[in-house]
């Protein structure tokens, strides 16, 4: 597995500025939409964070929630709707739900951080990345380690990836309780930790934890900072 700095995905300037679902805080923009992503880039974001879900006809769309109630006021699940039905929906600020392919095509220089939400979303997400030849500008992640590993195994070439929750917790236990024993094996197939500052009693934002991760060629990205 190539180390982090061998991937063009990590060549952006520091500090990394990830736009969580695009410029989602803007009063006139919807989250996870092409205008929201473009606005984030216009405001100096170095990376775009988004989520993939699968439609009923197995197309990867950029959408966070399982259903459309919060952002569109519709009591329906993304997985139950066809792409045509998804495209007919307008979000609360008039935005349209994009496919992953549309986003990769519309923003050809943008670097995407993709959280694969469900098992059915794996195949269409990989298909969109492969068709766009976007391996060098996409990082694949998931809260589910089996989903993350399945996605990586389905790709035709290596791609940047971040650790799942279980990976991060394992690394923290190694660092905090085992004096780093086993840390290298835990992070051998990840290039970044994407974590909250705190989770329950655990404080991830310590100099020692960040330093240990960086010594193992693992970047640390905190979410969310200013939402």
Which ranges hold each PLM region?
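Phosphate-group recognition and catalysis centered on beta-loop-alpha active-site segments
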Residues: 1-227
């Amino acid at each position: 597995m190539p180390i982090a700095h061998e991937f063009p995905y990590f060549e952006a300037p520091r500090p990394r500025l990830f736009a969580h679902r695009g410029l989602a805080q803007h009063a006139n923009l919807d989250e996870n939409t092409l205008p929201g992503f473009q606005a984030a880039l216009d405001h100096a974001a170095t990376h775009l964070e988004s989520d993939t879900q699968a439609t009923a006809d197995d197309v990867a769309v950029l959408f966070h929630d399982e259903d459309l109630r919060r952002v569109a006021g519709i009591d329906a699940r993304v997985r139950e709707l066809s792409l045509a039905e998804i495209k007919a929906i307008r979000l609360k600020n008039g935005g349209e739900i994009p496919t992953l392919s549309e986003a990769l095509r519309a923003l050809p220089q943008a670097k995407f951080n993709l959280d694969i939400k469900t098992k059915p979303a794996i195949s269409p997400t990989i298909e969109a990345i492969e068709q766009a030849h976007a391996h060098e500008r996409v990082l694949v992640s998931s809260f589910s380690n089996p989903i993350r590993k399945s996605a990586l195994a389905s790709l035709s070439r290596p791609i940047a990836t971040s650790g799942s929750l279980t990976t991060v917790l394992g690394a923290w236990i190694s660092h905090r309780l085992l004096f780093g024993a086993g840390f290298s094996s835990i992070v051998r197939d990840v290039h970044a930790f994407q974590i909250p500052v705190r989770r329950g009693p655990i404080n991830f934002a310590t100099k020692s934890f960040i330093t240990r991760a960086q010594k193992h060629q693992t970047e640390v990205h905190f979410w969310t900072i200013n939402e």
